[in-house]
Amino acid sequence: MFSLFHHPQLRPRHYAGGVVVISFIILFYGGALSSIFALGGELQWRAWFTDDYLQHLILFSFGQALLSTVLSIFFGLLLARALFYKPFLGKKWLLKLMSLTFVLPALVVIFGLIGIYGSSGWLAWLANLFGMSWQGHIYGLSGILIAHLFFNIPLAAQLFLQSLQSIPYQQRQLAAQLNLQGWQFVKLVEWPVFRQQCLPTFSLIFMLCFTSFTVVLTLGGGPQYTTLETAIYQAILFEFDLPKAALFAMLQFVFCLILFSLTSRFSLSNQNGLSNSNIWFEKPKSAVKIFHILVLLVFVFFLFSPVLNILISALSSSNLLTVWHNSQLWRALGYSLSIAPLSALLALTMAIALLLLSRRLEWLHYQKISQFIINAGMVILAIPILVLAMGLFLLLQDRDFSNIDLFIIVVFCNALSAMPFVLRILSAPFHNNMRYYENLCNSLGIVGWQRFYLIEWKTLRAPLRYAFALGLALSLGDFTAIALFGNQEFTSLPHLLYQQLGNYRNQDAAVTAGILLLLCGILFAFIHTYRDADDLSK
């Protein structure tokens, strides 16, 4: 392997940045995980594995993830078919707005869901209006499921919609000629493409739900509805039982590593390789049309009512003006607007360094090493950020932290958390540029910044801006790292919102949630502007 560095077409400018990033990842994760395993090695393992509480944690962690995933896929399938077969005004905008769930902070969504499904929410108010005694119950398993469905139904629907669009129109025309309708049509024409997409979609959503932290922490409502991830947080912050936290972190690491391996194996892709600009389908029957309309109406209410509730609550808050005199809000806003761009820039820089090395190795026909480089950047998907943060907490617990130290730790954690998504966005453009322009640049002697500015910038400009904006949005709403390291003097908007919700300061929480929603809405518009520009440039 070391002979690679003597290859005539592999210069230090190609690998220096990538080697530095990989070394940093190894040291960062190695130090954090070694502190966890060192403390976990002192435990009496047999006693713990017969512990009823631990067994309940593992069972509930997998159980809630399984239930959330099955429901997300089921409703996602229904929504995908309704979106595909029912033409309506504003469909393009609805499809874009479905992506809003990806950039909305979990705590903002939770605030909106409480306002709809809580004991004093919209649905309870409507029930009382019609003389019903129904009371909403958002805490516990029901609340966890509702929040997971909010985030994952749009994701599943978009993936299954791509599958429906990939069916050749000739197959649909042939099915119409053979009079295949109803379940026969679904079974013979649609199910084969759904089946290809089901396993990768299932593994992705299951992993997202299994590693869900903020949703379970806020809506769990008690020890009965606790997962391994939230148990780590509680063991550190509430009990200060570090050996117990280390055990939970080790188990979470092992489970996530297995899930990450499975998710990587069943990677999301259009497996039939077909893409159709000509979409044809036979018009559904009236009963099916009505069903599709009902599905769309229910989904629109489910998706937009929490967002609308946040806006109304923020604008009608009695503290809308006075809250701006609160120094805590300005401190949280200042830290959030400092952490987010630095984390996004760091994620972008590390991703570019890895991609420059990866694409050069692929060009030199070292495909396995090239893929290893990319997987190194995706490692955060296998090691949850809370496990990493807990390892750093153990490693540095004897140090007297200043706010600057905490700031740097959170920036690095958020950057590593965003890097897999940045890598996914930039991987194809960077590798395509290598394939298309490498020989041309070599023949003309164009290298370094000159190559980047004259040759690559045109195709990379839109995806780079898109990746930066997405990293910014993800870091802005990230709560995991700062949940462990935050305090009254070092806080962020999500951290402040969590404290306000915990102290039942709903009027203040409404304004904080509104600010976060506004910031994420601006970033969402920015993301889609450059995403559309990227699509046009292809």
From Swiss-Prot:
Pfam families: BPD_transp_1 (PF00528). The keyword Methyltransferase does not apply. Keywords: Cell inner membrane, Cell membrane, Membrane, Repeat, Transmembrane, Transmembrane helix, Transport. Residues 58-263, 333-528 form the ABC transmembrane type-1 domain. Its main location: membrane. One of its GO terms (molecular function) is transmembrane transporter activity. One of its GO terms (biological process) is thiamine transport. It is found in: Cell inner membrane. It comes from the Bacteria. The chain crosses the membrane at residues 19-39, 57-77, 97-117, 141-161, 202-222, 242-262, 293-313, 337-357, 376-396, 406-426, 466-486, 509-529. It is a multi-pass membrane protein. GO terms for cellular component: plasma membrane. Belongs to the binding-protein-dependent transport system permease family. CysTW subfamily. PANTHER family: MOLYBDENUM TRANSPORT SYSTEM PERMEASE PROTEIN MODB. The complex is composed of two ATP-binding proteins (ThiQ), two transmembrane proteins (ThiP) and a solute-binding protein (ThiB). Part of the ABC transporter complex ThiBPQ involved in thiamine import. Probably responsible for the translocation of the substrate across the membrane. This is Thiamine transport system permease protein ThiP. It comes from Haemophilus influenzae (strain ATCC 51907 / DSM 11121 / KW20 / Rd).
